[in-house]
């Protein structure tokens, strides 16, 4: 986190952790600290190790004290620092909170009671705070219930904070989001995690490639996401499939496909899909084999009010025919709620951005689902 102080210098606050020096461990676990550096030009930085500080252990645990976010609190006329923290003596599963420290000079910091403490998660990583319109928004990411970035909203910076029914921007493949605003556009920047061994069947790794969603505010204050105009405008050469015919499936049973060949490694796919009442599922398949069986799927499921990402095969073949992970009807945590009944017509407008192994779907410029 970087902020300009009253001394006309830029102050950077960042996490310090030493995994190898026992001096900075306790009971075999590394301690975490907030470190401080200053600059006059945002290029050359001077570290101030004497200002490094850890958690106030009368309130917080010393092992989770990271991701500082510093801002000027106009209501309190001071600088506040939000942190990913855990309450002292709390349960492992639900002890996480958004910690708070306060300063009047960016040098001396006092630990305060948590800024936000719902007693729901192991920790609240990468806290972020901003105001849009007349609402305040708190952003944080969790990995105990599931890997996802949440948001909360309030009328005042001091809360109370409320959770909308749909409180996320994306799914598993959009983590640790932080936001920034230029003019009237606010973006949420996160990572699409890589997979171990660059394999579909590998576990997600910690870190990956940058991805960004533009944040929009509804009239009721809830947040939606869309692709940025800058990203969409990159794709200048339009290739329209010729002789597209209506595709009809009677009795809502069976499968029928329309094939568009020649998909590029980097491309944007745009389409409007109209579906009938009672449709069980429809969608788009990417990077399919000649039998239209193996590949990746973005599937709309009106009956379940969701959009999911799937792939086939779902696992490396096993000894028995039924070793196909049929009990996982889509890729774990790659599911987005979607209210089909709220559509004025039974139509969805989709944009699918593809770059190498990354696929990002936007629906009606309100919902995003990213996969690798």
Range-by-range predicted roles:
Residues 70, 176-178:
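Short, surface-exposed beta-strand/loop micro-motifs that present aromatic residues
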Residues 156, 163, 172, 181-189, ...:
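Beta-rich accessory regions
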């Amino acid at each position: 986190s970087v902020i300009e102080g009253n001394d006309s210098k830029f102050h950077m606050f960042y996490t310090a952790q030493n995994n190898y020096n026992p001096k900075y461990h306790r009971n075999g676990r590394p301690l975490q600290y907030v470190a401080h550096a200053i600059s006059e030009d945002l290029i050359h930085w001077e570290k101030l190790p004497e200002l490094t500080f850890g958690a106030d252990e009368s309130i917080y645990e010393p092992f989770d004290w990271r991701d500082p976010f510093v801002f000027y609190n106009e209501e309190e006329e001071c600088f506040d620092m939000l942190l990913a923290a855990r309450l002292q003596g709390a349960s492992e599963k639900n002890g996480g909170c958004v910690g708070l420290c306060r300063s009047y000079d960016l040098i001396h910091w006092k630990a305060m009671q948590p800024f936000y403490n719902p007693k729901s998660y192991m920790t609240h990583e990468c806290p972020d705070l901003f105001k849009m319109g007349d609402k305040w928004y708190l952003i944080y990411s969790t990995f105990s219930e599931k890997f996802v970035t949440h948001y909360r909203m309030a009328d005042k910076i001091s809360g109370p904070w409320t959770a909308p029914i749909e409180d996320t921007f994306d799914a598993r493949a959009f983590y640790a989001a932080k936001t920034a605003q230029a003019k009237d556009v606010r973006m949420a920047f996160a990572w699409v995690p890589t997979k171990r061994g660059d394999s579909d069947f590998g576990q997600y790794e910690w870190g990956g490639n940058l991805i960004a969603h533009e944040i929009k505010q509804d009239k009721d204050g809830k947040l939606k996401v869309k692709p940025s105009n800058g990203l969409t405008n990159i794709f200048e050469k339009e290739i329209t499939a010729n002789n597209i015919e209506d595709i009809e499936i009677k009795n809502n049973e069976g499968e029928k496909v329309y094939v568009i060949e020649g998909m590029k490694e980097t491309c944007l796919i745009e389409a409007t899909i109209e579906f009938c009442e009672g449709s069980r599922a429809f969608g788009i398949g990417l990077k399919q084999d000649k039998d239209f069986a193996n590949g990746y799927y973005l599937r709309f499921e009106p009956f379940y009010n969701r959009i999911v990402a799937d792939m086939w095969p779902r696992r490396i073949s096993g000894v028995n025919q039924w070793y196909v992970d049929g009990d996982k009807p889509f890729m774990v945590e790659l599911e987005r709620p979607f209210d089909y009944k709220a559509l004025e017509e039974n139509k969805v407008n989709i944009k699918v951005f593809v770059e190498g192994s990354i696929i990002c779907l936007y629906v009606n410029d309100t919902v995003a689902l990213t996969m690798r």
